[in-house]
């Protein structure tokens, strides 16, 4: 097995036994990136000098007996996290030359744990997209089929795991942006509860929906990554001061008596036959493990996509107002006056999908439409939250598809934004409810593309869904399959 094939816990064991050094593991990963990434385009920026310096520091820590689970592990970050001294673009021309003066909290925590950051990953521009196609640096490709999308917006975060060009990655999830690409790329992807992980130093898309989470090769790695970044942060007023359990210790493999809900609104006509088959087989696997199933209803699911695209775009139109060419980022040349500079800078700097969402959000917030659209969407959001809270009175977790279909071809849905938006129909409600969910590999399509299942947990119930995901993983072999790239 190559060094770049190892999971976090496998690599940790070898580093601990001094069978190899972090420098060796990092060099192997950098060589893998150089060999494979030109085909996949998962990276925007690779940082070999910084990575090797961090690996040398990690080796010194290990030699001194100061070793955490992530010490010396090569990881990569979605290019939405600000990184001190390293270009941070959010996959947008408007931030092409932006080099932040500080690290975001999640980045700082990874560094404190001794992780080695090898680069910044491609994504949909400003995290707005479901396919990885809206990046100013070109689309990310799915390592399982280079003609297909990897999912979005954390496209590079999942593609790098599938291509084995990072041992683990961090992404963000606003409407499914970790879980959907994890499903399409055959990885484990976790969206923690809103407030579980600090958003300080994450470039904002929709502040009430964004959340930081890991993408990994297996559930144990996912638990280790969450352990490293979770916790209260005084720099983020939305982070919540609740205890952080030992997630890896909770992976017992025991789900006997666990009650799993099956929402009728998610098992609908039009679900791809391969996705339905994978979910049916997963249900039987859980039955064999002793889990119990309860039919439930989440009655306001039908309104989730419309609600999301009003709230998220409204928040985006406000958050993205700061990019005007004065303080940082791209500034147009030869503007006649200040207003002309604002207009031209934003016209040149933002891509089509970002402009579309800014316009939708500005319209929803405009005088005469605020009550009819934005305020009504917030009321529906409350109903969706209440649906989940009621369901969790009867069940411990909810089992659903992640996406209605496996990965589709690049360019297939770009001309039809509504079809693209519906790709996230099963993931968006979780963000609106502010709770947690994990995607875990559960099958393959007839065309050889991965399919994931989604486990949704109570607020701050990450321990339960990780335990359930781990039990499924132990009973199946889907997570061991590798893209032939």
Curated annotation (Swiss-Prot):
Q: Which Gene3D superfamilies match?
A: Amidase signature (AS) domain
What GO molecular function annotations does the UniProt record carry, in alphabetical order?
ATP binding; glutaminyl-tRNA synthase (glutamine-hydrolyzing) activity
TM region(s), chain numbering? none
The UniProt entry annotates the active site at 78 (charge relay system), 153 (charge relay system), 177 (acyl-ester intermediate)
* Keyword flag Ribonucleoprotein: no
Q: Which family does it belong to?
A: Belongs to the amidase family. GatA subfamily.
Q: How does it assemble?
A: Heterotrimer of A, B and C subunits.
This protein is called what?
A: Glutamyl-tRNA(Gln) amidotransferase subunit A
- From what organism does this protein derive? Geobacter metallireducens (strain ATCC 53774 / DSM 7210 / GS-15)
Q: Which gene encodes it?
A: gatA
């Amino acid at each position: 097995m190559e060094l770049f094939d190892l999971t976090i816990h496998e690599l940790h064991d070898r580093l601990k036994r001094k069978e190899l050094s972090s420098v060796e593991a990092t060099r192997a990963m950098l060589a893998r990136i150089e060999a494979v990434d030109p085909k996949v385009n998962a990276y925007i920026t690779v940082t070999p000098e910084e990575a090797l310096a961090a690996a040398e520091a990690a080796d010194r820590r290990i030699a001194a007996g100061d070793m955490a689970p992530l010490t010396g592990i090569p990881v990569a970050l979605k290019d939405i996290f600000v990184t001190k001294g390293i270009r941070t673009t959010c996959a947008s021309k408007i931030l092409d030359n932006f080099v932040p003066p500080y690290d975001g909290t999640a980045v700082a925590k990874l560094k404190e744990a001794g992780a080695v950051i090898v680069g910044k990953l491609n994504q949909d521009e400003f995290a707005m997209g479901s396919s990885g196609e809206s990046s100013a640096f070109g689309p990310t490709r799915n390592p399982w089929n280079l003609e297909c999308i990897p999912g979005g917006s954390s496209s590079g975060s999942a593609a790098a795991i599938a291509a084995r060009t990072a041992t683990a990655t961090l992404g963000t999830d606003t409407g499914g942006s970790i879980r959907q690409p994890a499903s399409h790329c055959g990885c484990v992807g976790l969206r923690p509860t809103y407030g579980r992980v600090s958003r300080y130093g994450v470039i904002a898309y929709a502040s009430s929906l964004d959340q930081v989470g890991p993408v990994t090769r297996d559930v144990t790695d996912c638990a280790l990554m969450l352990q490293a970044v979770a916790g209260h942060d005084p720099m983020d007023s939305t982070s919540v001061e609740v205890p952080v359990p030992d997630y890896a210790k909770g992976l017992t493999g025991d789900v006997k008596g666990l009650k799993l809900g099956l929402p009728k609104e998610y098992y609908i006509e039009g679900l791809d036959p391969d996705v339905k088959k994978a979910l049916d087989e997963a249900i039987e696997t859980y039955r064999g493990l002793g889990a119990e199933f309860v039919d439930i209803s989440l009655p306001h699911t039908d309104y989730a996509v419309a609600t999301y695209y009003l709230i998220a775009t409204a928040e985006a139109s406000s958050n993205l107002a700061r990019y005007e060419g004065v303080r940082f980022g791209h500034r147009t040349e030869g503007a006649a006056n200040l207003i002309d500079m604002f207009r031209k800078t934003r016209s040149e700097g933002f891509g089509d999908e970002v402009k579309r969402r800014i316009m939708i959000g500005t319209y929803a917030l405009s005088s005469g439409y605020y009550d009819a659209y934005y305020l009504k969407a917030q009321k529906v959001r409350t109903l969706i939250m209440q649906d989940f809270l009621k369901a969790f009175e009867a069940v411990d977790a909810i089992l659903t598809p992640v996406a209605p279909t496996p990965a589709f071809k690049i360019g297939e849905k770009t001309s039809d934004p509504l079809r693209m938006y519906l790709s996230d129909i099963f993931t968006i409600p979780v963000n609106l409810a502010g709770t947690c969910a994990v995607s875990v590999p559960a099958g393959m399509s007839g065309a050889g593309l991965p399919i994931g299942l989604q486990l949704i947990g109570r607020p701050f119930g990450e321990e339960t869904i990780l335990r359930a995901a781990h039990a499924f993983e132990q009973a199946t072999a889907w997570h061991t399959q590798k893209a032939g790239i």
